[in-house]
Amino acid sequence: MNIALIAHDEKKEDMIQFTTAYTHVLSKHRLFATGTTGMKISNATGLQIHRFQSGPLGGDQQIGAMIANGEMDMIIFFRDPLTAQPHEPDVSALMRLCDVHQIPLVTNIAGAEIFIHGLSRGDLKWREIIKERQEKEGTP
C-alpha cells in the first residue's frame, strides 16, 4: 500500500516515535512524506521514504495529486490543532480529497494506532483487490 506520513512542526517528534514503534509494519509498504517529516523519519528509522516538498511549499498538494490519481491508500497526518498553519487551505483540500476518494485519513496518534493495527491485520486489503480489478477491467 502507498501510505503518506505528514506532521506539523509541533507533531514531528510524535511522528518519529510512532514510526519508530511501527517500523516493522511500515517497512512492508511504500511510504511518502512531506519534506522535513520524511527526512526526520528516515534518519530515525532507516525507512525508505519518497519525500515531497515541505507542506507549505506544496508537499500537501503533491500528496493530494496522488490521491486524485488513485495512487494513495492511506494518510497518517499528525496535525497541530492549536497552531495556525499558513497553508491551512492546502490541508483542508487534502482532507477533502480523502473524503471524495474514500482514502482513510487519521489526524492524531490515537487514530494512527488503530490504523496501523488494522493495516498489520490486513483490514485494508480490499483496496488492493479493487485496484487489481480496476486494472483488469481498465477502469479508473
From Swiss-Prot:
One Gene Ontology MF term: methylglyoxal synthase activity
Protein's UniProt keywords contain RNA-binding: no
SMART domains linked to this entry: MGS
Keywords, comma-separated and alphabetical: Lyase
Any GO BP annotation: methylglyoxal biosynthetic process
A Pfam family it matches: MGS
Swiss-Prot/TrEMBL catalytic activity: dihydroxyacetone phosphate = methylglyoxal + phosphate
Domain MGS-like stretches: 1-140
Residues of the active site: 60
Enzyme Commission number(s): 4.2.3.3
Gene Ontology annotations for the cellular component aspect, listed alphabetically: cytosol
Protein residues bound to substrate: 8, 12, 34-37, 54-55, 87
Family that this chain belongs to: Belongs to the methylglyoxal synthase family.
Functional description taken from the UniProt entry: Catalyzes the formation of methylglyoxal from dihydroxyacetone phosphate.
PANTHER family from the UniProt entry: METHYLGLYOXAL SYNTHASE
NCBIfam families the record matches: MGSA, PRK05234.1
Record-given protein name: Methylglyoxal synthase
Protein encoded by which gene: mgsA
